[in-house]
């Protein structure tokens, strides 16, 4: 394994493949989408009366938690739900890990937009809730970014890589 810092150099000989979060465009790499394009709006599981959110407009009353790799998330959300201009999409605490952001929501720090694949277990267990279950996309949105299986262009013929790719994408 090669430790992740901020990007991968797919010309490095020790790098066979990576799972990356982004838009699927990395120089020198083939990328296959895995998951993560469906984004969920999540709120603390407290009583609805304590966090009353009945329409997308109500979201403006709360602290919006943001992830550093998707700074446009709240802007995209507000455009999807027709409330652009009602929220400041750049205000609110930033996190660099989605799991930390989910825990912040669980602690009542605010609302967050998180890839559904990373928060579905917490939603199902009732640890967080989707405050707009009847809205389009259950209050979330479809994103242009997600998780991708990537590998260097020069490694497409590696048998082990082909087997792993087929298993992962099945």
Please tell me what each predicted stretch does.
Residues 86-130, 135-136:
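Hydrophobic hinge/microswitch elements
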Residues 5, 20-24, 44-45, 97, ...:
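Beta->alpha turn/N-cap motifs
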Residues 133-170:
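A late-sequence structural motif
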Residues 9-11, 30-33, 55-57, 83-85, ...:
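Short secondary-structure boundary/capping segments
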Residues 13-20, 39, 106-111, 127:
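Alpha-to-beta junction loops
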Residues 63-84:
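Secondary-structure junction motif
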Residues 27-65:
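Flexible hinge/capping segments at coil-to-helix
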Residues 1-27:
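Central regulatory/effector-binding core of bacterial HTH transcription factors
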């Amino acid at each position: 394994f090669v430790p992740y810092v901020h990007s991968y150099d797919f010309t490095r000989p020790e790098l066979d493949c990576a799972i990356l979060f982004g838009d699927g465009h990395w120089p020198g790499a083939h990328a296959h989408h895995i998951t993560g394009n469906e984004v969920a709006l999540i709120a603390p599981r407290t009583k609805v009366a304590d966090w009353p959110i009945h329409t997308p407009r109500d979201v403006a009353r709360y602290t919006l938690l943001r992830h550093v790799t998707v700074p446009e998330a709240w802007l995209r959300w507000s455009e999807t739900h027709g409330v652009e201009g009602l929220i400041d999409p750049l205000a609110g605490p930033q996190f660099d890990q989605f799991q930390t952001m989910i825990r912040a929501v669980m602690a009542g720090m605010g609302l967050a937009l998180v890839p559904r694949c990373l928060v579905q277990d917490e939603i199902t267990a009732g640890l967080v809730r989707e405050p707009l279950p009847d809205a389009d996309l259950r209050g979330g949105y479809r994103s242009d970014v997600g998780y991708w299986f990537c590998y260097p262009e020069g490694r497409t013929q590696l048998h082990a890589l082909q087997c792993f790719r087929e298993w992962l994408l099945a």
